[in-house]
């Protein structure tokens, strides 16, 4: 997926979950930018961190910029747009290029089942698969961890997937998408959200398909790369 032209900035501070103050490196001007990722991001959003941003499409928006990438001190890139994960998976499903779901046809995105909405509904030889996608940005070395903040909604969805998987008409899966260029494995971060980690383990034990995929990330492009191990 091609990224728009990005402007180099430096992180100043974070007034709230969805807004960051940045300093342009070309004009030294301080600007406000929308932050698409509401996670804690404590390891990334440190004073002086390099942020790559794009101008807002809507000239009337309160924040004139959107934060797209963060560059770590080691030179790794991390996507700050959680929506990229679903966009990449949708493209890969449509083109049959996602190894873990080979042969499955994309039927619907944001499918409602009961009182909940799930990311994707897939079909294969009369079978139906419900798929949830999770974006992973927290990394320590080459290990990715999820979540980086408590996600009650995420745990609820995983338990609903587990219940669906026990029904004869459904199969279910969770796909963790690394949005950090250096991640080669994914683990559950139980010290941040023990309930989500418990829900994933229960899901895995009851047959929910748990998988993860890495990404190739640059300031020009982002694309899914290889299937990587998940530790549950």
From Swiss-Prot:
InterPro entries: SfsA, SfsA_C, SfsA_N. GO terms for molecular function: DNA binding. It comes from the Bacteria. HAMAP family: SfsA. Belongs to the SfsA family. This is Sugar fermentation stimulation protein homolog.
């Amino acid at each position: 997926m091609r990224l728009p032209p990005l402007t180099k900035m430096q992180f100043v501070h974070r007034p709230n979950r969805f807004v960051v103050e940045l300093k342009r490196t070309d004009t030294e001007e301080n600007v406000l930018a929308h932050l698409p990722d509401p996670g804690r991001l404590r390891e990334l959003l440190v004073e002086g961190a390099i942020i790559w941003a794009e101008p807002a499409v809507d000239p009337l928006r309160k924040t004139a910029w959107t934060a797209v990438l963060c560059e770590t001190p080691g030179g790794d890139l991390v996507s700050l747009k959680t929506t990229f994960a679903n966009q990449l998976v949708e493209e890969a499903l449509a083109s049959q290029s996602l190894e873990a779901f080979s042969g499955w046809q994309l039927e619907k995105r944001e499918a409602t089942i009961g009182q909940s909405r799930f990311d994707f509904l897939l079909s294969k030889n009369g079978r139906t698969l419900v798929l949830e996608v999770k974006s992973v940005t927290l990394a320590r070395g080459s290990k990715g961890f999820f979540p980086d903040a408590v996600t009650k909604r995420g745990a609820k969805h995983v338990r609903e997937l587990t219940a669906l998987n026990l029904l004869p008409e459904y199969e279910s899966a969770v796909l963790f998408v690394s949005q950090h260029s250096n991640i080669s494995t994914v683990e559950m971060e139980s010290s941040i959200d023990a309930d989500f980690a418990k829900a994933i383990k229960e899901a895995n034990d009851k047959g929910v398909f748990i998988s993860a995929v890495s990404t190739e990330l640059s300031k020009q492009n982002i694309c899914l790369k290889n299937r990587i191990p998940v530790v549950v």
